[in-house]
Amino acid sequence: MSILLKGGLILYDTSYHPTRADILIEGDKIVEVKRNINKAADEVIDASHSLIIPAFINAHTHSPMVIFRGLAEDVPLMDWLQNYIWPAERKLKRKEVYWGAKLALLEMVHSGISTFVDMYFYMEEVARATLEVGLRGFLGYGMVDLEDEEKRRKEIKETEKLHEFITKLNSKLVKFILAPHAPYTCSLDCLKWVAEKSREWDSLVTIHLAETRDEIKIMEEKYGRSPVEVLKEANLLNDKLIAAHGIWLSKKDLEMLASSNVTIAHCPASNMKLGSGIFPMRDAIDEDINVALGTDGAASNNTLDIIREMRLASLLQKVNTLNPAIVKSEEIFRMATINGAKALKLKAGIIKEGYIADIAVINLKRSHLLPLHNPLATLIFSAKAGDIDTLIVSGRVIMLDGEVLTIDEEKVIDKFLGVGI
């Protein structure tokens, strides 16, 4: 299968210099980017009024939690979890997780997301939804043992079961990831088991880290050390680890994460909404930490719009430091694209020959996007999810002219109309 995108304005390579050109895709790869490509293709897409960008990578979310959008509002994280989310989750059935994931995946398609890192339960259902929609998912069972040996055995069994299930799928798009929930909800024995299996299975790991001051206090009381130091003791600090949030990190913590090549998945909307704190972005970047971007779940965001996430990530740092130059648009865009690809060991996240054909096309015929003096700044500060017109994932057109081609979107929407009040 070949696709030819004609005449688009492209944010090419990592310089993001706007270039008017064509893009030829063969199979799942970008094979040519230049003006006036005259080769035949199975599908030709007119992109003459479009901005063409690498598709986004959502480095931290909980897709089925879209079911709880708006359920718990104006409360801090621990209250949100213990009194609202965890009780509601205990009632969830497999079928509900499947439909919730499908709704979330549709929202991510319209946000221009090709790839997401997901932590939840009943992940076989999320895998099924992911394959049907056609996105790329790194799926992990969220392990929580709370120092209970019997529960730890159950969590290990569930994780092994998911690993076997995804391995047997042998899919290019659905990948396994180990997903211990957090250092304060997982015992040291559980974390050490995860580290061991990460090496044995050559698996990536995702975990919540230093999200709140309460977490820091819990870890100090329990271990006399920071959460980062506990992860080091568990042998989890390495380039396979994607740590979500990373708000309450000391200089020593940042240095340890940097020297271990850990990725931090920054989730500004969730952090702001739950009053968790502000990620020390400049300090992390200056330590040469790979910072990616995540939406977190729609229960705490309350959207999966990663364009809005880029905007919030930039604005939050500017106002917090009273410095409009504290972070550049190029740095923010990298977080949502190539930095996520680096964390996931994917040759993706940029538009360049030889890279995976994960591409989002933005319709520029929108009043809020014109005039176009600076395409990258316009994308971050003016665009929104609904501006994504076409999405290509691994060389396959998932959405064209705003219409999702892989599943019946109306059927999914109808499933949730009337749910709530």
Curated annotation (Swiss-Prot):
PANTHER family: AMIDOHYDROLASE-RELATED DOMAIN-CONTAINING PROTEIN (PTHR43794:SF11), AMINOHYDROLASE SSNA-RELATED (PTHR43794). It is an enzyme of class 3 (hydrolase). Binds 1 zinc ion per subunit. Catalyzes the deamination of 5-methylthioadenosine and S-adenosyl-L-homocysteine into 5-methylthioinosine and S-inosyl-L-homocysteine, respectively. Is also able to deaminate adenosine. It comes from the Archaea. Keywords: Hydrolase, Metal-binding, Zinc. Substrate binds at E89, H181, E211, D296. GO terms for molecular function: 5'-methylthioadenosine deaminase activity; metal ion binding; S-adenosylhomocysteine deaminase activity. InterPro entries: Amidohydro-rel (IPR006680), Deaminase_MtaD/DadD (IPR023512), Metal-dep_hydrolase_composite (IPR011059), Metal_Hydrolase (IPR032466), MTA/SAH_deaminase (IPR050287). The keyword DNA-binding does not apply. The gene is mtaD. It catalyses: S-adenosyl-L-homocysteine + H2O + H(+) = S-inosyl-L-homocysteine + NH4(+); S-methyl-5'-thioadenosine + H2O + H(+) = S-methyl-5'-thioinosine + NH4(+). This is 5-methylthioadenosine/S-adenosylhomocysteine deaminase. Its cofactor is Zn(2+). It holds the Pfam family Amidohydro_1. Zn(2+) binds at H60, H62, H208, D296. The lineage of its organism: Archaea, Methanobacteriati, Methanobacteriota, Thermococci, Thermococcales. Its EC number is 3.5.4.28, 3.5.4.31. Belongs to the metallo-dependent hydrolases superfamily. MTA/SAH deaminase family.
